[in-house]
């Protein structure tokens, strides 16, 4: 099993700072879990025109990420509450 590093877009950390601390921590912990279980998860594209962008659900939240297997990097693009997706 390969180890993957995490990269967060700057806006994500600002958004998480506005959340209840326990939920922010849970979402951060889940991104670490995704990176450490990358080979055990099924990464389906979220749309045909967004190849490489995947999502993972945590309660009412969605984590959008991409994987750079050459550089062993999981890039977290956004963490969004499902109401904001409509």
Residues covered by each model-derived region:
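Enriched for short, Lys/Arg-rich terminal
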Residues: 1-26, 58-62, 66-86
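Compact soluble domain cores
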Residues: 23-35
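A short, surface-exposed loop/turn module that caps and links secondary-structure elements
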Residues: 32-57
């Amino acid at each position: 099993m390969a180890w993957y590093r995490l990269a967060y877009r700057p806006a994500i950390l600002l958004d998480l700072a506005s959340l209840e601390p326990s939920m922010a921590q849970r979402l951060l912990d889940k991104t670490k879990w995704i990176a450490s279980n990358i080979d055990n998860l099924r990464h389906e594209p979220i749309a045909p025109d967004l190849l490489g962008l995947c999502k993972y659900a945590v309660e009412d939240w969605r984590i959008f990420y991409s994987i750079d297997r050459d550089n062993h990097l999981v890039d977290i693009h956004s963490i969004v509450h499902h109401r904001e997706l409509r």
